[in-house]
Amino acid sequence: MPATGERGWRKLILALLAFVFLPELPQLRAILPVEQTIYLLVPALAACFLVGWWAGGRALVAIAWVSLAAWLMWERPGTPEAFHNLERGWSLLLAGAFGLTCLLGERRPLFARALGALSIAIFLAIAMSVTGPVPLSAAKETIASEFVHRNDETMAGINGVIGDHPKEWNDVTSRFPTFATMPAEIEKQLTTLSRVGLTVFPSLLSLESLIALALAWTIYHRLSRARLGAPLRPLREFRFNDQLVWGLMVGLTIVLLPTLQAFRGVGRNLLVFFYALYAIRGLGVLVWFLAPSAMAMTVGVGLVMLFSGFLWIQLFALAGFLIFLFASFVLGLGDTWADWRRRVRPTA
């Protein structure tokens, strides 16, 4: 019988749909490392079912998921070969490392296993880059080309719609002259986002990978009776080892010290990664004290505004999100020492 924390599909399906479809939005395509997140999710699920087979699960189900992952990883005509190879390689490294940490760390919580798998995958990726045929510089060029390719696709779609409906577009721009510059503004925005995405690619890839592992873990425990560990806890209970604050401190030190300028890229990525982790922890604190429905509605409205296509609305929403994320980060970082959730939760 499923554990209490493993019942229900509604929230899981919403999270899964967001993980699969939100990266298809133009602005997110321009900055996120993995656009087709199914490449991260399915191999991780296959790893879970393989470990589940070892723990007494059904062999046929494990073979089916491994076959699906193998089919997904198979190179197909029409895919950008260089970036697709990097994407597949990372997915397989991550899934293999996660399976290993699940086998060897039976008593560890999910986040510790996922973080361990991420560390192993990063170490192996760097080692393969140093000793293999694809150095880091070549990988960076491949990633930059992929971002350019995505942005070109987006702009081709926008310009194609405008070209197919010239009369309607002329009517709109005559009534609202500011719309005439919208395609150029969107292209400029996408280019800026891609520059940022290239700079912090490792940290964003790490965050996407952690989300994929969390989803794979949750889906597995909905579908299988062979337990691999405790269920994923709600966001309001999310916390991690307080010693991880040193990762944030190391990143800040590298960025601020002039003598470590050669490692500034590493420092930026450490800051982005741990900033995001502490912001999520802060969101957990907020959800602990506030109504989850109000939080979800606020975030939903903000996302609609952020991707509305109107520059001034987007800027307003972006400013609001940055303030909200900073407040969440401060709460999450403060939770390291204050442990807000040990305080009495308000009943009103």
PLM features: residue spans?
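Alpha-helical transmembrane segments
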Residues: 7-22, 61-71, 246-252
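Short helix-perturbing small/polar motifs within transmembrane alpha-helices
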Residues: 73-79, 88-129
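Membrane-interface interhelical loops and short interface/amphipathic helices
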Residues: 130-196
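Selected alpha-helical membrane-embedding segments in polytopic membrane proteins
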Residues: 174-233
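Small-residue-rich helix-loop
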Residues: 227-282, 288
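Extracellular/periplasmic helix-loop-helix junctions in multi-pass membrane proteins
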Residues: 258-271, 288-332
